[in-house]
């Protein structure tokens, strides 16, 4: 009998028949399938609710921070080892000014969950103890580097690098840096000489600096011992600390923290001997001659062998020879001689400088006044015109007088009587409208003959005529009516050329004659009846024309000292001024005036 359709009878597969699904035509119904699908166990697989964006930027920022932290930890592990400072400089690590407590902190962050943390990754602020060899108190030999630890990295990280540099300087040179220098607190204070100590400079740069500094300095002193280099430089112009540091950092390629700079001690013999004896060493480079402050304290010369006492007569002789009469000029000019003149140095070191200056000025005025009184007018004019340098044209004066319609022959005759103090011919008046050159003409003559000028504004003082006793020729400028009244009342005898009693300050009234007197005024005294007693005592010349000027606003007639020098030289015989000068030139030789205690044969 055949097997039923859809089944196979085989041994060992009986269970399959039990599990075989039953077929039905109902499975082909699509509506029933969809209805059953809605009742499935995975009906909530898809979320059909509205979607919210959330804070994505905060998440992105958190991820970036984690990446940065990981990179930072890698760099710390690579470059910031706890033993890095000790490996760079054990000696620097051993230096401690105060005890430090050990404080532990976590140097590297952990990447695990935070459990089972140990102290293996904790680093101490203070490095472990390092065995440091004993320091040798003896300076290192010149040019010998040895096993010097040039820990410039530790120097830059030190809190007080100046103290470390000073310690290394004293260790190298055997003398303190402050023993050779004086302190400038300001960086803007200028000085010509500077002491510079530089740490950890390459040898090639030191050699090159020996040549480069020569163009900036008059004197260079360089010495290198170990890692320290010492410079003494005297610049051609004053420099402040900032400029010096800028020059040295550029030239030596170093950091400013590696430099110590202060000006040297100028009045310390021990410091001067350090530089003087050091320049004789084999490892020292020097350029130029010794500065004055080193030479004066270490080198014995004729100036230092002289006595250091002040000699007032030497100061008076100097002021007399150089025509210094004012106290301010004497003090300033004599102080400028101090570096080369031992007497000026002694004067500066004295406590009574002002007293000596006043006494010197008084003595010079006494000598000059006595010299003037001894000279005649011819000698005086001859002396003063020969002090004028250069040559001029005497025709300028003649042309100006002709321009003002002045008879030159009459003017020459009046000038001759004026210079020889002829009675009642001892005063010349130049009158006319303003701006005609009266003051310019007379002032130029007073200037070349070293005369004095009177001012009537001081007439309330009884000493206003005192300058008449100290000159050979005087000028009273711009005489007005009150001045004419005063002259008509009190000065008739003086204009006559007779002796008068002249009251001088701090002195008894003295007997003297008026010197040659020049007057300028806008009033023609000869036309004034009220002053008829002055007509015979004053010779007048009128200046009617305005003073001519060029297009560039300069005088057309240049009335200079050289013009008057040429005028007197040309008209010397016409003015009858030749006798005294002929005796001076062709007679016996004249000895220069000497007012000091130095003998004439003494060596200069």
From Swiss-Prot:
Amino acid composition bias (Polar residues), ranges on this chain: 587-604
EC code(s) of this entry: 5.6.2.4
Biological process terms in GO annotation: DNA replication
Region (Disordered): 579-604
Keyword NADP: no
Matching Pfam families: PPV_E1_C (PF00519), PPV_E1_DBD (PF20450), PPV_E1_N (PF00524)
GO molecular function terms attached to this record: ATP binding; ATP hydrolysis activity; DNA binding; DNA helicase activity
Residues covered by the SF3 helicase domain: 406-556
Region (DNA-binding region): 144-307
Residues reported to bind ATP: 432-439
Enzyme class: isomerase
Position of the Glycyl lysine isopeptide (Lys-Gly) (interchain with G-Cter in SUMO) cross-link: 513
Post-translation changes: Phosphorylated. Sumoylated.
Compartments in which it is found: Host nucleus
Coiled coil regions in record: none
Motif (Nuclear localization signal): 76-78
Modified residues (Phosphoserine): 81, 89
Disulfide bridge partners, by residue number: none
Top-level taxon of the source organism: Viruses
Keywords: ATP-binding, DNA replication, DNA-binding, Early protein, Helicase, Host nucleus, Hydrolase, Isomerase, Isopeptide bond, Nucleotide-binding, Phosphoprotein, Ubl conjugation
Assembly: Can form hexamers. Interacts with E2 protein; this interaction increases E1 DNA binding specificity. Interacts with host DNA polymerase subunit POLA2. Interacts with host single stranded DNA-binding protein RPA1. Interacts with host TOP1; this interaction stimulates the enzymatic activity of TOP1.
Similarity field: Belongs to the papillomaviridae E1 protein family.
HAMAP family listed in its UniProt record: PPV_E1 (MF_04000)
Function: ATP-dependent DNA 3'-5' helicase required for initiation of viral DNA replication. It forms a complex with the viral E2 protein. The E1-E2 complex binds to the replication origin which contains binding sites for both proteins. During the initial step, a dimer of E1 interacts with a dimer of protein E2 leading to a complex that binds the viral origin of replication with high specificity. Then, a second dimer of E1 displaces the E2 dimer in an ATP-dependent manner to form the E1 tetramer.
Protein name per UniProt: Replication protein E1
Gene encoding the protein: E1
């Amino acid at each position: 009998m055949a097997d039923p359709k859809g089944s196979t009878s085989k041994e060992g597969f009986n269970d399959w028949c039990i599990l075989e699904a039953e077929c039905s035509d109902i499975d082909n119904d699509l509506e029933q399938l969809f209805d059953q699908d809605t009742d499935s166990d995975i009906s909530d697989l898809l979320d059909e609710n509205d979607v919210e964006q959330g804070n994505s930027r905060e998440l992105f920022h958190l991820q970036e921070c984690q990446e940065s932290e990981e990179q930072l930890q890698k760099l710390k592990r690579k470059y910031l080892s706890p033993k890095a400072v000790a490996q760079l400089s054990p000696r620097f690590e051993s230096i401690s000014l105060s005890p430090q407590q050990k404080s532990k902190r976590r140097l590297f962050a952990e990447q695990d969950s935070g459990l089972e943390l140990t102290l293996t990754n904790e680093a101490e602020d203070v490095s472990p103890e390092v065995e440091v060899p004993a320091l040798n108190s003896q300076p290192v030999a010149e040019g010998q580097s040895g096993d010097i630890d040039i820990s410039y990295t530790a120097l830059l990280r030190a809190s007080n690098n100046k103290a470390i540099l000073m310690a290394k300087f004293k260790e190298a040179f055997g003398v303190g840096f402050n023993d050779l220098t004086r302190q400038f607190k300001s960086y803007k204070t200028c000085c010509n000489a500077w002491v510079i100590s530089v740490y950890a400079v390459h040898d090639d740069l030191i050699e090159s600096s020996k040549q480069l500094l020569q163009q900036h300095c008059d004197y260079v002193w360089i010495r290198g011992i170990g890692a320290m280099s010492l410079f003494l430089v005297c610049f051609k112009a004053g420099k402040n600390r900032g400029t010096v540091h800028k020059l040295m950092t550029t030239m030596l390629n170093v950091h400013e923290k590696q430099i110590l700079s202060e000006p040297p001690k100028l009045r310390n013999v021990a410091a001067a001997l350090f530089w003087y004896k050091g320049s004789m060493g084999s490892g020292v480079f020097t350029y130029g001659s010794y500065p004055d402050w080193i030479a004066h304290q270490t080198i014995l010369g004729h100036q230092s062998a002289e006595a250091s006492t002040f000699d007032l007569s030497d100061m008076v002789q100097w002021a007399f020879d150089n025509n210094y009469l004012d106290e301010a000029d004497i003090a300033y000019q004599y102080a400028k001689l101090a570096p080369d003149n031992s007497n000026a140095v002694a004067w500066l070191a004295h406590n009574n400088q002002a007293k000596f200056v006043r006494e010197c000025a008084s003595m010079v005025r006494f000598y000059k006044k006595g010299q003037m009184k001894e000279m005649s007018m011819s000698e005086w004019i001859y002396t003063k015109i020969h002090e004028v340098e250069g040559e001029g044209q005497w025709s300028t004066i003649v042309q100006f007088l002709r321009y003002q319609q002045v008879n030159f022959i009459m003017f020459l005759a009046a000038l001759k009587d004026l210079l020889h103090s002829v009675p009642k011919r001892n005063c010349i008046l130049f009158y006319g409208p303003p701006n005609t050159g009266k003051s310019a003409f007379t002032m130029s003559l007073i200037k070349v003959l070293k005369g004095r000028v009177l001012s009537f504004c001081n007439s309330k003082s009884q000493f206003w005529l005192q300058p008449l006793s100290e000159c050979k020729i005087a000028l009273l400028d711009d005489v007005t009516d009150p001045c004419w009244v005063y002259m008509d009342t009190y000065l008739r005898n003086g204009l006559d050329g007779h002796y008068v009693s002249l009251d001088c300050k701090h002195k008894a009234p003295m007997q003297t004659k008026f010197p040659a007197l020049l007057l300028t005024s806008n009033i023609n005294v000869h036309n004034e009846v009220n002053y008829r007693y002055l007509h015979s005592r004053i010779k007048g010349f009128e200046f009617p024309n305005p003073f001519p000027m060029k297009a560039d606003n300069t005088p057309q007639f240049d009335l200079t000292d050289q013009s008057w020098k040429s005028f007197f030289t040309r008209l010397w015989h016409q003015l009858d001024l030749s006798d005294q000068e002929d005796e001076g030139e062709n007679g016996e030789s004249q000895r220069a005036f000497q007012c000091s205690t130095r003998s004439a044969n003494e060596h200069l």
